[in-house]
């Protein structure tokens, strides 16, 4: 799934250390979900095609960063598999700012990282801004670093205000939300409650999440899935634990390598 986001996004992971290595940003997407889907259909019964099709259902075009991709995948992943089952999402769709605000100096558009399709709610991954503030000022260009961090912080605040003026509530997601037990659970439930209040959603799409989000056994398993995806060394161990658990439960444990030159 995460490889799909990378191939269809504007970043690449370190080929030698994809989990913890540095990512490169601002690259052209290698392909897109539609073209991969066409290839899978063309491949027919080739080994791994069905597994690839299942994975592709959780991939969306135009992710701008690995962490954004992780949050999007978890939002799409069913609760039975350790995700949140929030329905469809869209990534980095540009929203035009009201002309009246642009005339007062606001940016002419803003781009929320993730939107819950059919709602006015979304997410922005804001990373480790406060750590950067604490670390800036220690080097030769500390003053410039601190000013840059401050400018980014202020722009994030203005971004959220301007999106709110467009009728969109965009919740920040931090690295602490992902690493802390049930931290992301709280953010996702907040998004659901806002969507129900703001968009008057009554189709039951969020009923499962609200019913199951507080169950301790599911919270623990879901957090283990989250930890298995994150860019830190223990992630490999959590991923192996989950694979071993699936194998013991009778799921086939296989690694399918498919080279797709689309």
Task: Annotate each language-model stretch with its function.
Residues 25-262:
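Surface segments flanking catalytic/ligand-binding clefts of nucleic-acid enzymes
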Residues 1-27:
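Hydrophobic alpha-helical segments and helix pairs
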């Amino acid at each position: 799934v995460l490889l799909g986001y990378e191939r269809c996004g504007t970043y690449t992971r370190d080929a030698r250390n994809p989990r913890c290595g540095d990512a490169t940003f601002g690259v052209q997407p290698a392909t897109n979900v539609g073209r991969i889907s066409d290839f899978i259909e063309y491949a027919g019964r080739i080994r791994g095609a069905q597994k690839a099709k299942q994975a592709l259902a959780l991939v969306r075009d135009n992710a701008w960063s690995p962490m954004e991709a992780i949050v999007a995948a978890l939002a799409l992943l069913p609760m039975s598999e350790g995700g949140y089952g929030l329905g469809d999402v869209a990534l980095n769709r540009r929203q035009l700012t009201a002309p009246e605000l642009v005339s007062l100096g606001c940016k002419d558009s803003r781009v929320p990282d993730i939107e819950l399709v059919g709602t006015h709610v979304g997410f922005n991954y804001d990373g480790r801004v406060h750590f950067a503030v604490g670390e800036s000022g220690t080097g030769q260009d500390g003053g410039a670093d601190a000013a840059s961090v401050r400018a980014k912080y202020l722009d994030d605040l203005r971004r959220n205000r301007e999106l709110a003026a467009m009728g969109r509530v965009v919740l920040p997601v931090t690295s602490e939300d992902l690493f802390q037990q049930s931290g992301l659970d709280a953010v996702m439930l907040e998004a659901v409650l806002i969507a129900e209040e703001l968009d008057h959603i009554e189709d039951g799409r969020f009923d499962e999440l609200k019913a199951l989000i507080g169950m301790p056994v599911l919270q623990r398993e879901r957090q283990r899935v989250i930890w298995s995806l994150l860019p830190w060394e223990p992630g490999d161990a959590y991923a192996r634990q989950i694979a071993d658990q699936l194998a013991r439960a009778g799921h086939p444990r296989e690694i399918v390598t498919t080279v797709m030159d689309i």
